[in-house]
Amino acid sequence: MKKYDVIAFDLDGTLTDPEHGLVEGFIYAFKKMGVTDYGDRDSLRRFIGPSLYKVWQDEFGFTPETVVEAIEKFREYYNIYGWWDNKVYPGIREMLAELKKAGKTIVLATSKPEDTALKIMSLFELDQYFDFLGGAKGDNRDHKWQVLEYSLDAVGADRKSAVLIGDRMYDAEGAAKCGVDCIGVTWGHGSQKELEDAGATCIADTPEDVLKMLI
C-alpha cells in the first residue's frame, strides 16, 4: 500500500462511539419539533456521521429555517448531556500512539461542530496524539470535504501523501472531492458495502488493520 505521511481521522464512528448520546439528542429534537414518524432507535443511527442540515431537510422536508430550529433543539440536549455520553473504541489509543511513534502527522477532520469536537478529544485525552484538530464551523466549513481541506491545509499536507480514515460514505465522498484516499472502517456506523460503493480506497475491520496499512 502507498505510503501516507498525513493521517486524517473522522471522529464519530471512527475514534469514538457517540451513538447513545446522539440518538437521545435526535429524539429530543424531533419531539420538540412535533415530528412523530422518525422511526425506532436503530433507524436513527443513519443520522450519525453526515451534516444534519441537508439530511434532515431531505428526510423530513424541513425548510432551511426549520432545520436550523431543529438543530438548535438537538443542541439544547446534546451540548449538556449528549456530548460526553460517548466512548472510545477498543484499540484506538494504541493505534494513535503507534502512528505518532512512527512520525505520522495526525489531524482530525470531523463534521461535528469544532467546539464540541475539541471537548470530546480533551475529555478522552485523544488530543495528545494530534497535530491539528479541525471541525465544522459556519456555512463555509460544514461539509466533510470542507473540513478535510481545512485540516490538511493547516499542516501543509500534500494531498498525494494524505489519507482520511472514516466509517461512512460521506467520508469516502469527501476524501474523493479533496483528491485524497480513504480507508473505510467497519467498526462504526457504516457497512463495508456502503463504503465500497462510495469509493473507499480500502477497508479495515479493526484499528490493528489500519496500523498494518499505514506502517
PLM feature spans:
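Conserved Lys-Pro-Asp/Glu-containing loop-to-beta segment of HAD-superfamily phosphomonoesterases
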Residues: 6, 144-173
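Acidic, Mg2+-coordinating phosphoryl-transfer loop and its flanking beta/alpha structural elements
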Residues: 163-204
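Glycine-rich phosphate-binding loop signature in dinucleotide/nucleotide-binding domains
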Residues: 1-2, 101-104, 154-159
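Substrate-recognition element of Asp-dependent hydrolases with the DxDx(T/V) motif
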Residues: 26, 92-121, 136
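N-terminal helical cap/lid subdomain that shapes the substrate entry/recognition surface
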Residues: 2-93
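A short, structured active-site edge motif that brings together acidic residues
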Residues: 127-142
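Conserved H-loop
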Residues: 36, 126-131, 158-159, 201-204
